[in-house]
């Protein structure tokens, strides 16, 4: 009836008003708000190590119980390195190590990848020389990226190598040999001493973020036969931890070197 329609219109009007008031700037604009930004100002507050010299006693007392819990999680040693490892293009000891770990982890998930790829942008810290803690691993791989496995044709793998060349290098596993130019062109590509067969199929271990075609590695969007293992153990930092722990159980230190996987000519 008429009264019902009027009530419904009132309710709808109230709802629209609520959206306008509580929505984002886009919602406000859509509702033709009369308000406009008259001026804007900003300032920069640098929060860095300078504050460590004079810690606030009250704040330190407040976080103390939480700090103990964090330390208990971050300080356990998982292994040792032979030297400090850092990242850098076109290749580095740390990026080589992480790409190799991707391949190494394949057996944990019933996979036999022929190569591994680890994006430089996902490496956020260096590894120290000597003892390495869980916290060190978290600093290197702070994101919840997960290992995954996929297949590319040889033609698409060559496209991937061209994209890696264009970016000046990414983390690639042992057996990959790329020759690139200073301006990011791919000159030659080999895998385990063999030319890439355009008609072949190649199994690759990488991170899910990379497999989605991010970091300008769009060749991964052509992937097939994707295997994304579930579970917490699939997080990249836990995969890295297990590698260190296995080495430690054998009394071995973790070592990685630059070996000419990506050469600029």
Where are these regions (language model features)?
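Hard-cation-handling environments
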Residues: 40, 44-126
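C-terminal motif of bacterial Sec signal peptides marking the signal peptidase cleavage site
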Residues: 27-30
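Bacterial N-terminal signal peptides that target proteins for export
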Residues: 6-20
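Intrinsic-disorder-associated, low-complexity terminal segments enriched in Asp/Asn/His/Tyr and depleted
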Residues: 1-5
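Feature captures C-terminal
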Residues: 33-48, 97-99, 103-105, 111-116, ...
């Amino acid at each position: 009836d008429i009264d019902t329609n009027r009530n419904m219109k009132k309710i709808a009007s109230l709802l629209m008003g609520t959206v306008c008031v509580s929505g984002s700037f886009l919602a406000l604009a859509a509702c033709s708000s009369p308000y406009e930004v008259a001026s804007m100002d900003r300032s920069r507050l640098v929060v860095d190590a300078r504050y460590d010299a004079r810690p606030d006693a009250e704040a330190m007392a407040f976080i103390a119980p939480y700090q103990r819990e964090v330390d208990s999680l971050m300080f356990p040693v998982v292994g040792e390195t032979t030297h400090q490892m850092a990242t850098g293009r076109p290749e580095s000891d740390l990026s080589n190590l992480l790409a190799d770990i991707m391949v190494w982890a394949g057996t944990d998930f019933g996979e036999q990848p022929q190569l591994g790829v680890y994006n430089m942008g996902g490496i956020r810290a260096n590894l120290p020389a000597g003892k390495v803690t869980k916290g060190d691993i978290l600093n290197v791989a702070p994101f919840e990226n997960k290992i995954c496995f996929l297949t590319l044709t040889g033609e698409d793998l060559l496209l991937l190598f061209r994209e890696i060349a264009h970016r000046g290098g990414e983390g690639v596993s042992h057996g990959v040999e790329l020759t690139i130019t200073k301006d990011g062109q791919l000159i030659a590509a080999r895998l385990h001493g063999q030319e890439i067969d355009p008609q072949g199929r190649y199994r690759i271990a990488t991170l899910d973020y990379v497999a989605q075609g991010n970091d300008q590695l769009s060749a991964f969007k052509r992937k097939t036969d994707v295997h994304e293992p579930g579970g917490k153990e699939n997080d990249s930092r836990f995969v890295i931890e297990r590698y260190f722990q296995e080495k430690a159980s054998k009394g071995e230190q973790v070592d990685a070197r630059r070996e000419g996987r990506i050469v600029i000519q």
